[in-house]
Amino acid sequence: MYFPTSATVIEFLILAIVDKEDSYGYAISHTIKKVANIKESTLYPILKKLEKAGYLNTYQQEYQGRKRKYYTTTERGKQQLTFLKGEWQLYTNKIEEIVEGRLEDDEK
């Protein structure tokens, strides 16, 4: 995609992905890469930040003889996701208004 993706948008996407289903880093990264060009080296610090903020919890589960770290949303994470959904809607509505020439200029 042409448009750069901020860390806040990545946080929003992570919360949305994990809220639908507990997931692990590689799977989260694979899903986000469908809309944003990110590297795992970018993703993991954001996952850690969300965990430290209390938005995500982790647990380990064995998969093919190895332990895999899964992420799950907390109640606080669900609240943050709801907030970010609202902010995203406002943001995209304003962009759409500008693109379509419907945004009123307050300084006129």
Give the residues covered by each predicted segment.
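Short, hydrophobic-biased segments on the C-terminal half of alpha helices
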Residues: 47-49
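Amphipathic alpha-helical dimerization/coiled-coil segments
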Residues: 82-108
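Glycine-centered, phosphate/nucleic-acid-interacting loop/turn motifs that mediate DNA/RNA or nucleotide
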Residues: 54
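N-terminal helix-turn-helix DNA-binding core of bacterial DNA-binding proteins
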Residues: 2-42
